[in-house]
Amino acid sequence: MRNTKPYIIAEMGVNFYDTARALNISPLEAAKMYIDGASEAGCDCAKFQSYKADTIVSKNSPAYWDLSKEPTKTQYALFQKHDGFNEKDYRELCEYTHAKGMDFTSTPFDYASADYLEDMVDFYKISSSDLSNLPFIQYIAKKGKK
């Protein structure tokens, strides 16, 4: 049996947007609350998701979820609700996360996100939805992150 400490990644995703709405605070404040919680719990890394709705889904893609729980009728509208951060915001979260002694990463869902995250993330995490997207995986792999 290996005697090593597990590396614990706190998956922030885009969940903080709902928390921000519920608490009437900015998404950036909510994301920092999540980072604080992860740090206090002893996590090693805070992981986010970076995308723009325009780059990952058609504006006409219908909802595939239970509309009684999430009334948003298109995938585009749902993703648009959670894509408000820009490079400056992610940089602020990166610095905040590092100041807490944790690694920072964000799953890029498009080439532009992969590019602007390059000097921020400690490593890339590929989304399961992109596992068959070999050109995108190769593009990220060429960046040489370990």
What does each model-found stretch correspond to?
Residues P6, N86-Y90, S113-Y116, I126-G144:
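Active-site-adjacent beta->alpha loops and helix N-cap segments on the catalytic face
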Residues N24-A38, P108-A114:
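Short, acidic/polar
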